[in-house]
C-alpha cells in the first residue's frame, strides 16, 4: 500500500515537473525555417510562405512568432518594408508577454523597418530600445548587430563620435 502511494506521488511529481518545463513545439516547416534563417533566408522564407494559409488558426503566440520569422527573413533578403504596422503588432504582443528575447529581436527589426523607410531618428530610437533590452538578454550576436546598425546610422547622420562609441559596443 505504501509503495503504491509512493509511486502515485512520484508520478504526480513527474507530471507537474514536465508540465512546468514544457517546451514550445513548432510545426516542422517553422523549425526548418529557423534552422535555415542565417544561411539560406530565401529557403526559410519559402518554408514560412508555405505555412501562411494555416497560421490564422494557430494560437496567437505561435502566429506572432511566425510573423516575426517572416519579418526576419525578409530583412535578411533585403526586401524593403514600407509600413511599421506589422512590427508594431509583434512588439505589442511581446511587451504584453514580457518576453525580452523576442522583444529585443522585434525592436531590432523595428529599427530595420525605419532604416528601410529612411527614417533614421526613429530607427535609432528602436535600435537603442533593442540595445536596452539586450542588457537583460544574452544574445551577443544580436547585440553586435544592433550596435553595428547604430554605428552606421550615426555615421550617416555625421554623428561620428556616437558612431565610434556604437562601433566599440559592437
Can you describe what each PLM-predicted range is?
Residues 2-11, 16-170:
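A "functional boundary" signal
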Amino acid at each position: 500500500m505504501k509503495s503504491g502511494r509512493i509511486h502515485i506521488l512520484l508520478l504526480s511529481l513527474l507530471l507537474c515537473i514536465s508540465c512546468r518545463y514544457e517546451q514550445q513545439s513548432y510545426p516542422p516547416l517553422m523549425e526548418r525555417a529557423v534552422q535555415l534563417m542565417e544561411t539560406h533566408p530565401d529557403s526559410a522564407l519559402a518554408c514560412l510562405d508555405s505555412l501562411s494559409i494555416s497560421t490564422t488558426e494557430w494560437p496567437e503566440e505561435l502566429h506572432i512568432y511566425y510573423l516575426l520569422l517572416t519579418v526576419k527573413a525578409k530583412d535578411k533578403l533585403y526586401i524593403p518594408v514600407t509600413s511599421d504596422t506589422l512590427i508594431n503588432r509583434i512588439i505589442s504582443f511581446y511587451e504584453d508577454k514580457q518576453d525580452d528575447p523576442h522583444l529585443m529581436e522585434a525592436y531590432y527589426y523595428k529599427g530595420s523597418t525605419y532604416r528601410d523607410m529612411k527614417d533614421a531618428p526613429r530607427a535609432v530610437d528602436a535600435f537603442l530600445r533593442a540595445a536596452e533590452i539586450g542588457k537583460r538578454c544574452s544574445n551577443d550576436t544580436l547585440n553586435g548587430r544592433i550596435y553595428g546598425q547604430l554605428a552606421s546610422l550615426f555615421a550617416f547622420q555625421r554623428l561620428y563620435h556616437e558612431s565610434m562609441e556604437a562601433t566599440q559596443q559592437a
